[in-house]
C-alpha cells in the first residue's frame, strides 16, 4: 500500500481534530461576540444565549435568543442549538449545519450571525457518537456514517414539518466528515433539500479506509486515532459505499468550498464531485488548509451568502 496514502488517511482524522481544536474554537470566538448564557440545565429544554451586536450605524442591537433543541431519531437523542432571526410573521428558510469528525455544534455557531441576518434560521447539533464532546452521546466507538445520515435525515424531516419553516428552502451545510454526511443526505432526500454547501468535504472517507483495511479481516474491533476510539462497524458499513455514484442523485444547486493547501482532502475529489453534480461550483480559497482561519472563513461565508441569494 502506498505510504503517502496511509499518511493522508491518518492525517484526515488527526488534522481534523487539530484544526477544529485550534482553529475552529478561535473562529467561533471571533464570530460570536459578547456572548451571555443563561443555562437552565439539561432538565429544561432551553438554554438561552443572547448576542449583543452592532448594527451598520454602530448602535447596540440585541439579536434573537439561541435555544437548545433536542430532536429524537428512534432511540437516539440529538442535542442542538437553534438560532432564529427576528420574527417577520412569515415562514423562514433554515440552514442545518453538520460538524466533522470529533467536532460539535460549537464549531458551527460561526455561521449563525450572517445567516440569521439573511433571514435564515440555523440549527447546529452534535451527532450522537460523533465526538468525545458530543452532548448527544459521546461513545465514539459506536460512530457510524449511516447513523449520522439517518440523524440528518430526521432533522430535515423535523424542520420540514414545522409551521414557521419554509419547507421549500432547506439548506444543508456540512464540513469535512459532516460534508460527506450532508452529501449523502441530500442524495437520499432530493425533494426535501433545496441547496447543498460542502466545506472541505471528506468524500474520500470510504476509499481511504478501504485502502487502509483492504480485507474485512484486517479491520480490528477498535481503531483509535488521537484518543478517539472507533468501532469496527464504522469501517464495515462504508466498504461498499460508492460516494460519487450516490451523491449525483441530488440535482439541485451545490457549492463546494475548499482551500488549495488542504493536505487532508484532495482537491481532485471536490473537482470530481463538481463534474458529477448537475449544478455545482467549486470555490477555491488560496493557501487555506483543512479548516479556515478567520479571514478565510470570511471569504467562505461571503461565497456561501452569494450562493444562497441566487434564485
Model-derived regions: residue spans:
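Conserved alpha/beta-hydrolase
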Residues: 115-135
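Hydrolase active-site cap/lid region
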Residues: 184-232
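N-terminal cap/lid segment of alpha/beta-hydrolase-fold proteins
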Residues: 35, 40-87
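Short beta-strand/loop motif that positions the catalytic acidic residue
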Residues: 250, 256-258, 262
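The serine-hydrolase catalytic nucleophile loop
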Residues: 101-113
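Conserved alpha/beta-hydrolase "acid-adjacent" motif
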Residues: 263-269
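Catalytic histidine-centered segment of alpha/beta-hydrolase-like enzymes
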Residues: 288-299
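Alpha/beta-hydrolase active-site loop
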Residues: 141-163
Amino acid at each position: 500500500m502506498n505510504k503517502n496514502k496511509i499518511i493522508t488517511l491518518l492525517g484526515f482524522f488527526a488534522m481534523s481534530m487539530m484544526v477544529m481544536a485550534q482553529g475552529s474554537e478561535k473562529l467561533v470566538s471571533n464570530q460570536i461576540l459578547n456572548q451571555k448564557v443563561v443555562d437552565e440545565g439539561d432538565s429544561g429544554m432551553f438554554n438561552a444565549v443572547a448576542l449583543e451586536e452592532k448594527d451598520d450605524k454602530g448602535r447596540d442591537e440585541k439579536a434573537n435568543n439561541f435555544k437548545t433543541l433536542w430532536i429524537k431519531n428512534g432511540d437516539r437523542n440529538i442535542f442542538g442549538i437553534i438560532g432564529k432571526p427576528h420574527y417577520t410573521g412569515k415562514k423562514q428558510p433554515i440552514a442545518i449545519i453538520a460538524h466533522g469528525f470529533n467536532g460539535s455544534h460549537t464549531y458551527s455557531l460561526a455561521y449563525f450571525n450572517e445567516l440569521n441576518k439573511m433571514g435564515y434560521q440555523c440549527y447546529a447539533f452534535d451527532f450522537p457518537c460523533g465526538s468525545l464532546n458530543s452532548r448527544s452521546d459521546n461513545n465514539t466507538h459506536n460512530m457510524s456514517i449511516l447513523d449520522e445520515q439517518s440523524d440528518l435525515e430526521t432533522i430535515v424531516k423535523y424542520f420540514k414539518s414545522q409551521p414557521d419553516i419554509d419547507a421549500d428552502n432547506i439548506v444543508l451545510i456540512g464540513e469535512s466528515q459532516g460534508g460527506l454526511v450532508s452529501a449523502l443526505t441530500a442524495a437520499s432526500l432530493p425533494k426535501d433539500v433545496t441547496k447543498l454547501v460542502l466545506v472541505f468535504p471528506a468524500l474520500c472517507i470510504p476509499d481511504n479506509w478501504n485502502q487502509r483495511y483492504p480485507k474485512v479481516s484486517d479491520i480490528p474491533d477498535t481503531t483509535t486515532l488521537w484518543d478517539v476510539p472507533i468501532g469496527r462497524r464504522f469501517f464495515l458499513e462504508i466498504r461498499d459505499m460508492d460516494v460519487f455514484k450516490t451523491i449525483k442523485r441530488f440535482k439541485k444547486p451545490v457549492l463546494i468550498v475548499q482551500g488549495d493547501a488542504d493536505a487532508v482532502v484532495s482537491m481532485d475529489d471536490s473537482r470530481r464531485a463538481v463534474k458529477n453534480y448537475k449544478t455545482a461550483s467549486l470555490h477555491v480559497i488560496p493557501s487555506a488548509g483543512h479548516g479556515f482561519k478567520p479571514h478565510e472563513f470570511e471569504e467562505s461565508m461571503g461565497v456561501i451568502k452569494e450562493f444562497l441569494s441566487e434564485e
